[in-house]
Amino acid sequence: MTRSLKKGPFVADHLLNKIENLNAKEEKKVIITWSRASTIVPAMIGHTIAVHNGREHLPVFITELMIRHKLGEFASTRTFRSHLKKSDKKSRR
């Protein structure tokens, strides 16, 4: 189920305050956050936000196409290790 439009998007207060302060100063710094559930809003365009994936912070550069998505969508939490190959099983018999 999607979020109600009358509530507006969820953005962590500390993250929104940092974005607004940087926009007022016209600075571009990497912002470190653990808030994967925050929605990307137009004020974030052009900033780099380092999103925590459980082990490290991954830098995500915000573009216009990312608006209304969550920050956690762009920082994968799982690593894929390839499946085992079946080449050596016959030689063991």
Curated annotation (Swiss-Prot):
Cellular localization per UniProt: Plastid, Chloroplast
Top-rank taxon, per record: Eukaryota
SUPFAM superfamilies: Ribosomal protein S19
GO molecular function annotation: rRNA binding; structural constituent of ribosome
UniProt-listed Pfam families: Ribosomal_S19
Any one Gene Ontology cellular component term annotated for this protein: chloroplast
One Gene Ontology term from the biological process aspect of the record: translation
Keywords annotated in UniProt: Chloroplast, Plastid, Ribonucleoprotein, Ribosomal protein, RNA-binding, rRNA-binding
Alphabetical list of InterPro entries matching this protein: Ribosomal_uS19, Ribosomal_uS19_bac-type, Ribosomal_uS19_SF
Keyword Cell wall biogenesis/degradation: no
Coarse class of the protein's main subcellular location: plastid
Role, per record: Protein S19 forms a complex with S13 that binds strongly to the 16S ribosomal RNA.
Family, similarity comment: Belongs to the universal ribosomal protein uS19 family.
Name of the protein this chain belongs to: Small ribosomal subunit protein uS19c
